[in-house]
Amino acid sequence: TATREQMVTFLARFAEFSGVDTTATGDLGDFTDASKVSAYAEDAMTWAVHTGIIHGMGNGKLDPKGTATRAQFATTALRLYDLLQA
């Protein structure tokens, strides 16, 4: 299993390897649990939120330590695929 922040970090690294600029812009202040994002995942999570790769859980939270489901991984991977095709 992987956490949501691990999933996003993996996707950001793949995007960077594929030539996408993954420089983080903005912050995660809109999410009440932004402070729970690990330091290693902060830039990746910020990039993923601001590019639409990942969305919150619908309750104002990112749930970075929560387990990433297969559906969440498939959805975020498809969003990254769409970004790479643009």
Feature map (PLM): residue ranges:
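Feature responds to low-complexity, polar/acidic, surface-exposed segments characteristic
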Residues: 1-42, 55-67, 79-86
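Catalytic cores of secreted/periplasmic or lumenal enzymes
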Residues: 45
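Phosphate/pyrophosphate-binding loop motifs in nucleotide- or prenyl diphosphate-using proteins
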Residues: 52
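Acidic helix/loop microenvironments that form the catalytic cleft of cell-wall polysaccharide enzymes
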Residues: 68-72
